[in-house]
């Protein structure tokens, strides 16, 4: 009997934990992320690691930027992870640990560390994960794992987003060291950055539309007040 979770099972679990509707453009983002994580987690070769967690957390936070209300955003993230039958607190904790690490060291050191050519105190267990990945021919690579690695580089050098040549060089070194498919990873990161820009533009357009609607409502409200005031004055004059 096959007990593997289906996409439908994952979605049901998600909506069990998060019962409120998801706003407009963000709904598609969550649907795609939910399905992507499902397909990764049910794969027989899937194994959780903190770098994947960082990718999930980063992708969620970036694509959900500006979401309101904030408490719903937290609920959506928790349900996203619970839908995969995993612990959202572990994802957040492991992601923060890597972010804190990257915030303390230089760009060259973080790259050397990821490439297994430099040791950093108290991070042996993380480097063991990377080494195991490099030696595992069945490692389940994913776009979210790639985003996690890229996020570490981005934290120490924000110019990587703008400087494609520099970004490509660093990512190629990582691919060679961890035995990852270079073409696939580079394409995934380029697509990720492109999607971030597209969502940011959609969010900006939505905010402009909402602002215009707000101004129209305020104008109509002011016109009603003026009309009412004018009517009252006319009535007083006739008396």
From Swiss-Prot:
Region called Disordered, residue ranges: 217-239
Coiled coil found in the keyword field: yes
UniProt-listed GO biological process terms: photosystem II assembly
Keywords annotated in UniProt: Coiled coil
Entry keyword Oxidoreductase: no
InterPro entries: Thf1
GO cellular component, one term: plasma membrane-derived thylakoid photosystem II
Signal peptide residue numbers: none
Coiled-coil residue spans: 158-216
Entry similarity comment: Belongs to the THF1 family.
Function statement: May be involved in photosynthetic membrane biogenesis.
Protein name per its UniProtKB record: Protein Thf1
Organism: Trichodesmium erythraeum (strain IMS101)
Gene name in the database record: thf1
